[in-house]
């Protein structure tokens, strides 16, 4: 068996998230992993033991990706370019294999990660743009972006982000490290882009952080309310969760290991 690593982009609008959802062994919803599994197994001529594609991040319904990473094992050794072309021929148009490389057998798309970067797009138009509604969150109330810029550093560092974890979070620890939190302002496009980098993120953490930051910008919260939320460890006090449509998995870093 030969292990391959693939960088995958997808439009999450018509998927019920990345992870396969089954009932009695039958897929019940359309997922990114489900489509990748079908394409990989078709390329491998439907082996007796089905091949499972493993993803680095289990993005939610409606979340997009430019740089999702997956790995899978094929029962033959062929040029990665051929794997990429073959899969793109078999996959639906809302998924694209951007690159494929061979990796060592101990590479794991999820457990070998060093860091992840996500960004979140916010449309600030007065009314929802029908051409952006699946690709941005919409916030039409007044925003003082200087307040947001002042608040962002409060997220940096290692913290217990329990207040920023949705009820579906299944990780044993809610401690995470954020290395970068930025706001890019695009006035000509009436858009804001939040960019977050960290070692890992909790379930819905980025969407909750964006919700809190927007409320800070709107004056509904004190500028340094993030410090209080980190201290109280109470999800109910974070309130607003930004919609999934604005969230993008941008890039996953696997460190310096050449096998990755």
Swiss-Prot record:
Subunit-level organization: Homodimer.
Entries under InterPro entries matching the protein: PsdUridine_synth_cat_dom_sf, PsdUridine_synth_TruA, PsdUridine_synth_TruA_a/b_dom, PsdUridine_synth_TruA_C, TruA/RsuA/RluB/E/F_N
Positions of the catalytic residues: 60 (nucleophile)
Record's function text: Formation of pseudouridine at positions 38, 39 and 40 in the anticodon stem and loop of transfer RNAs.
Residues in the signal sequence: none
Gene3D superfamilies on file: Pseudouridine synthase I, catalytic domain, C-terminal subdomain, Pseudouridine synthase I, catalytic domain, N-terminal subdomain
Protein name as catalogued: tRNA pseudouridine synthase A
Reaction(s) this enzyme catalyzes, per UniProt: uridine(38/39/40) in tRNA = pseudouridine(38/39/40) in tRNA
GO biological process: tRNA pseudouridine synthesis
Class of this enzyme: isomerase
Molecular functions per Gene Ontology: RNA binding; tRNA pseudouridine(38-40) synthase activity
SUPFAM superfamilies: Pseudouridine synthase
Organism: Leuconostoc citreum (strain KM20)
Keywords: Isomerase, tRNA processing
This enzyme's EC code(s): 5.4.99.12
Residues annotated as binding substrate: 118
Record family assignment: Belongs to the tRNA pseudouridine synthase TruA family.
């Amino acid at each position: 068996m030969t292990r391959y690593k693939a960088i995958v982009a997808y439009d999450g609008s018509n998927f019920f998230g990345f992870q396969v959802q089954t009932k009695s062994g039958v897929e019940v919803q359309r997922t990114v992993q489900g489509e990748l599994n079908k394409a990989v197994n078709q390329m491998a001529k439907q082996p007796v033991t089905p091949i499972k594609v493993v993803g680095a991040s289990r993005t939610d319904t409606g979340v997009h990706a430019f740089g999702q990473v997956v790995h899978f094992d094929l029962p033959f050794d062929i040029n990665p370019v051929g794997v990429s072309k073959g899969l793109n021929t078999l996959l639906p148009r809302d998924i694209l294999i951007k690159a494929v490389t061979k990796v060592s057998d101990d590479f794991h798309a999820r457990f070998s990660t060093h860091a992840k970067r996500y960004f979140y797009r916010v449309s600030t138009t007065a009314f929802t743009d029908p051409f952006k509604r699946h690709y941005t969150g919409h916030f039409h109330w007044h925003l003082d972006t200087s307040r947001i810029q002042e608040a962002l550093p409060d997220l940096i560092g290692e913290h217990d982000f329990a207040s920023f974890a949705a009820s579906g979070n299944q990780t044993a620890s809610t401690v995470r490290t954020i290395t970068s939190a930025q706001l890019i302002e695009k006035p000509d496009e009436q858009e804001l882009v939040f960019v977050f980098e960290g070692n890992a993120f909790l379930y819905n953490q980025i969407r909750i952080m964006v919700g809190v930051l927007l409320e800070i910008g709107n004056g509904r919260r004190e500028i340094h309310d993030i410090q209080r939320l980190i201290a109280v460890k109470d999800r109910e006090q974070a309130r607003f969760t930004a919609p999934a449509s604005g969230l993008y998995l941008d890039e996953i870093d696997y460190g310096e290991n050449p096998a990755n």
